Swiss-Prot record:
Pathway: Cofactor biosynthesis; adenosylcobalamin biosynthesis; cob(II)yrinate a,c-diamide from sirohydrochlorin (anaerobic route): step 6/10. SUPFAM superfamilies: CbiD-like. This is Cobalt-precorrin-5B C(1)-methyltransferase. It comes from Prochlorococcus marinus subsp. pastoris (strain CCMP1986 / NIES-2087 / MED4). Keywords: Cobalamin biosynthesis, Methyltransferase, S-adenosyl-L-methionine, Transferase.
Amino acid sequence: MKKGFSLPLWVTGAAKSAIKKLIGLPFEDYELIKIPKEKNLIKIKVHSAGLINEESQALGISFVDSGLDLDLTQNLEIWTIASLEKTYKTSNRPLDRINIIPGYGVGIDQKTSKICISDFAQKLLVENLLNIIPEGYTLNLEIVFPNGKFLAERTSNKSFGIVEGLSIIGTSAETFASASPDQLQNAKAQLKQIIANKVCDTIIFVIGENGLNLATSSNIKFPIIKVGNWIGPLLVDAAIQKIKTVILFGYHGKLIKLAGGIFHTHNHLADARIEILVYLAVKEEVPLEIIQKLSQSNTVEDALLVLESFSLSMADKLWNKLSDTIEKRSTEYINRYTKTDMKVGAIIFDRNRKIRWSGNNSKDYISAFKGF
């Protein structure tokens, strides 16, 4: 598989090139990017950099090469506009010297209007830009995705309160297709490392990038592994490795497939989310007229809104039942391949990134998640 790098690296490459141009250094068609807590440098190609606005600003441009042909951000054009502002305040906080501004096509939180950017992306910018900002100055860095607003319409960002464009939520340097064998091997390697280090006998399997961002920004003390679409094989591997408890953590639209026994969750292989929800609604004796509306819903999110508009308590009851069913079907799946006492829990968050539902096996753990 072709190797590629996540969105934050291409943003950082363009930004570094822009700042260097602004302070008078010659343009190079690549930048070496340092990854926090790692020794290696990654070479990121930069398309161009030049001075603009009467040389008061510099524009750096890069194009994402994620290595994944089906990735939404593949070939995404990135503009970073850098300017320096004299400051008379001293601060020990690195982010006080870098003002990250969401420009056109970059996602912001609908409630706060703050840029949607992961901790990894922020640390990456600080690691690579702080040392080249002249002493006594603050960097204003505007990030623009010219095609970001259009591309965001093809994501579930709005379900999470992210508007105006694409969020910058990459959490690692390299990219892996969620359905690729590389993703599976990477997750297995992480699991093996956790076991070798005897870190913990409870592990969090995170489904989806938003779930990973939510989990890693918390104070959860358990190890976290992003599992992509390879949930089934990784659950079996964890059981074989004698892990005591695995908590599945994710958005309801991602996890619902497990309740239907679908353990490779890529959409091109299987979907059936609405059908699974309708089946559970029938078992829970939801009124027929509501079941009919559920069956006509385009998305799981729409179905949840239908239920909540009818009865909040019924919606919560059904989604807790969904969590419980996920736990039971996961255990059944594992036992097809190996006999185990490993418990599988399921904790689900909603469109507002609010953690709301859990199954019987995860009731003792949900308070740890709700603590942030």
